[in-house]
Structures are given as structure tokens and as C-alpha cells.
């Protein structure tokens, strides 16, 4: 950590405590926002994520417009996410060994540069292979960004508000998921994909500026003994022998592999599968490309549901009962996807994506919260790297498999098959809950006690109803 990141006592108190004496009036749902550092992160990241979602939608539509192939859509998804599976362990080691704030600044600058290059190529003349290369490079950046950013949250708010910070972070992500796709759908239909990529590049300025303005207190850090490979193997072994975390990550990996590819196939639904809606909206917006408008609406609907799910989690003050939430939300995600795949009406499908997004976000955020509550701080970056491998690292295999199956079996049947597997996973996880709950309670109490929480408060937050 550099000297510029070590605040004096007054600065440290200001950055990790309420921003004013009146901050006690902040609603419990927003309590992490009493921390100045999290305020800076939240505001900048919200702007940046709107740009990110604009790029995600525009890139999918660009690939589909250039190729018309579900397999190529899946292949670009594979190229963009497989680096997370391969390099997230390295990213986790970096997050545990180096200044996490500086790591996140570096990844945000790299992402900005890649977005601007994609914009320049698209506004001139772009080939599909260039999209593949840039997607893969962004995936490498994400392999360092995700564990760094996830483990940096605790330094912004402390362990006492970590659960709320995770939930608000998810709320921010999905608030952007509503705005970004809607804006992208209109921009793509009116002026093309390149300007969406350019807007994303500029949006990174907000989060980078916020990170530079933070005053982060130094974290307690024990110098590592042994090689980085040894440390990563140690973390993987710890995850595997820790039953609750192993079960959460296996379920998360299953869903990412078989059910999450629905997002990759969304351009096909917008253009070929769904009918009977969107024409009036496209006419009102004076948009030439009805498919792009539909895609923006569908992705935005998922974001609305996911935002509601994240806000539901943010309203909680403890981890009690989250295991049940994981099981129920995973099952609900699968059932909602089955209904979506069966629909052929655009507006009905848009409505069905609300519970899809809601349940998806509840499972992801509840799993993240439970894992972070159980993991020791000195292993947080590496364990979150394993989380990234299961959450984002399995997705590329699912995207490639989903694209190939959709070319052979059609997109609706592909999604239905994956959704049925997600329901089966939810049933399995629910059957393991009694055993999971006992060990999870022990781990959460141990970590909370290590953070200095009174035993009666820990019991109130952890013991199942």
C-alpha cells in the first residue's frame, strides 16, 4: 500500500464512519451508504455499469447482425468469459497480496481502453474476429477485477455493513441493468452500436475518479509464506472441505452452466421467436431496427426483476434464513425460465422476465453474502476468485453449449432443458440444508467473533428462525 493510501486518524474515522452526525437517520436498507468510501464507489460504479450494460447489449446485437448465428453468439460469450475461469485464481492471489484499491483502479482503466478501441473499430470497419479478441482481453481484465472488487467491499464499509454493501452493490448493478439495455436498444436502432461502446468507455471516468478520491484505511496483512500456487491450492482445498461453501458454489456453478445461457440467446428471441409486440414502441422512438428495441426491453425487464431482488436482500439485517432463500430462488429461477421459453408473445415474455431476474439475483446475492460471512479475511480474495470461477467461469461453457444446441434444437428448447436442471439443483440443495445450516452457523459465528461482535448480536443474526 502506498503512503497516499494511509490516512491520518481523522481521515480514517471519516471514511469508515457516518458522513455526518445525522447519518443515523439513514434507513437500514441503505446503511452502507453512511460510509464515504462506499458513497464514492456507488455513484461512480452506477454510471460505469450503465455503460457496461449498454456495451453488453450492443455487442450481442452486433455479433448477431454480422453473423446471424446462435453458435457465434455463444462463441463470443465463451471468449469473453473463459479467461475468468482460467485466470480468476491469479486475480484472487493478487487481491490478497496487493493493494485492492490499486488493483481495481488498474482494471477499470484497462476496461475503459478496451471499450474505446471497440468503439473506434465499430465506427470504422470491424470484423467478427476483432470482437472475439477484445472480448477475450476484457475477460482477462475481469478475472482480476471481480475478486479485487468483491474483496475490496469490506475495506469500504467494514464487516458490520458488508451484507448491506453486497446487496446495494447488486441493486446498483441491476439498476444499471434496467437503464443500460433500454438506452442501448434505442441507440443501436437509431445510430448504431459504435456509439454505445464509446459511451461505455467514457463512463469509466466516473468510477475511476471515485476510486482516486477514496481514503482507505490500511488493512491488517500478514506477509505470505510460500508460493502463490500453494496459496491458491490452499484456498481451493479449504473451499472443498467447507461443506456450506462447497454446496453454494456447486449450485451456483450448475446454474451458470445450464441456465444463464438464456442471456446469450436473447437476440434470437428478440428477432425470431417472439412476435406481437414492440412495433408501436419502435415507431414512437423512430427506431429503424425493431429487433434491437425488443432486445433492449427484454434485457431491461430482467434488470427490473433483479433490482427488486437485490433491494429485497438489502432490507435484511442478518444472514438468518438465507440458505432457504438460495434454494427457493434457484427453483423459482428455473420455473420462470420454463414459462418464458414457452411464451411466443413479446409482452408476456417481458413480464415473465421479471421473476427470472428477481430469482436469479436473490440466489446470486444470497450466496455471495453467505460465503463472505463465512470466509476468513486473509483468504477472502482467493475464495472470491473461486466464486468468480463458478459464477462467471462456468458461464462460457454454458454459452458455447447453449449456442450450439440452439442452432440444432432451437432456443426455447435449449433454455427449457437448462431450466429443468436448475430446478433439480434447487431440490438437491434444499435436501442438504439441515446439514449445511449447522456448519454454516459455526463458521459465521467464528468470523463475526473474530471481528469483535458481541456474542448476543451474533446469535441474533445467525440462529435460524
Model-assigned labels for residue ranges:
Residues 2-465:
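Alpha-helical transmembrane-bundle signature of multi-pass membrane transport and export proteins
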Amino acid at each position: 500500500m502506498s503512503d497516499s493510501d494511509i490516512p491520518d486518524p481523522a481521515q480514517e474515522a471519516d471514511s469508515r464512519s457516518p458522513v455526518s452526525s445525522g447519518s443515523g437517520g439513514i434507513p437500514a436498507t441503505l446503511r452502507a451508504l453512511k460510509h464515504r468510501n462506499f458513497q464514492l464507489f456507488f455513484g461512480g460504479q452506477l454510471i460505469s455499469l450503465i455503460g457496461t450494460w449498454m456495451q453488453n447489449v450492443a455487442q450481442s446485437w452486433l455479433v448477431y447482425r454480422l453473423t446471424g448465428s446462435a453458435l457465434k453468439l455463444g462463441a463470443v460469450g465463451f471468449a469473453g468469459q473463459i479467461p475468468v475461469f482460467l485466470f480468476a485464481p491469479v486475480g484472487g492471489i493478487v487481491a490478497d497480496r496487493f493493494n485492492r484499491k490499486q488493483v481495481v483502479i488498474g482494471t477499470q482503466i484497462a476496461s475503459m481502453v478496451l471499450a474505446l478501441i471497440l468503439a473506434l473499430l465499430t465506427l470504422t470497419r470491424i470484423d467478427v474476429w476483432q470482437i472475439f479478441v477484445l472480448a477475450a482481453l476484457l475477460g482477462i481484465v475481469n478475472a482480476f477485477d471481480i475478486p479485487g472488487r468483491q474483496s475490496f467491499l469490506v475495506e469500504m464499509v467494514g464487516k458490520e455493513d458488508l451484507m448491506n454493501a453486497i446487496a446495494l452493490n447488486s441493486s446498483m448493478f441491476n439498476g444499471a441493468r434496467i437503464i443500460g439495455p433500454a438506452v442501448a436498444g434505442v441507440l443501436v436502432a437509431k445510430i448504431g452500436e459504435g456509439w454505445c461502446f464509446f459511451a461505455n468507455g467514457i463512463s469509466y471516468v466516473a468510477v475511476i475518479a471515485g476510486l482516486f478520491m477514496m481514503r482507505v484505511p490500511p488493512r491488517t496483512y500478514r506477509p505470505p509464506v510460500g508460493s502463490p500456487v500453494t496459496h491458491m491450492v490452499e484456498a481451493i482445498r479449504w473451499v472443498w472441505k467447507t461443506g456450506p461453501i462447497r454446496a453454494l458454489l456447486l449450485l451456483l456453478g450448475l446454474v451458470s452452466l445450464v441456465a444463464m445461457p438464456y442471456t446469450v440467446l436473447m437476440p434470437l428471441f428478440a428477432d425470431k421467436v417472439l412476435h406481437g409486440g414492440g412495433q408501436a414502441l419502435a415507431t414512437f422512438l423512430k427506431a429503424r431496427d425493431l429487433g434491437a428495441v425488443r432486445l433492449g426491453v427484454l434485457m431491461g425487464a430482467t434488470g427490473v426483476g433483479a433490482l427488486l431482488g437485490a433491494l429485497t436482500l438489502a432490507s435484511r439485517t442478518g444472514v438468518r434464513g438465507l440458505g432457504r432463500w438460495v434454494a427457493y430462488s434457484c427453483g423459482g429461477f428455473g420455473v420462470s425460465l420454463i414459462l418464458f421459453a414457452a411464451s411466443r408473445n413479446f409482452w408476456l415474455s417481458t413480464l415473465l422476465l421479471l421473476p427470472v431476474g428477481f430469482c436469479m439475483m436473490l440466489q446470486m446475492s444470497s450466496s455471495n453474502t453467505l460465503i463472505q460471512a463465512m470466509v476468513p479475511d486473509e483468504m477472502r480474495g482467493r475464495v472470491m476468485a473461486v466464486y468468480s470461477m463458478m459464477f462467471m467461469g462456468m458461464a462460457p461453457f454454458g454459452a458455447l453449449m447453449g449456442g450450439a444446441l440452439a442452432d440444432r434444437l432451437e432456443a426455447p428448447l435449449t433454455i427449457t432443458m437448462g431450466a429443468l436442471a436448475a430446478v433439480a439443483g434447487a431440490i438437491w440443495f434444499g435436501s442438504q440444508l439441515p446439514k449445511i445450516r449447522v456448519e454454516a452457523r459455526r463458521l459465521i459465528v467464528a468470523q463475526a467473533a473474530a471481528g469483535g461482535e458481541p456474542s448476543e448480536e451474533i446469535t441474533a443474526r445467525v440462529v435460524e428462525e
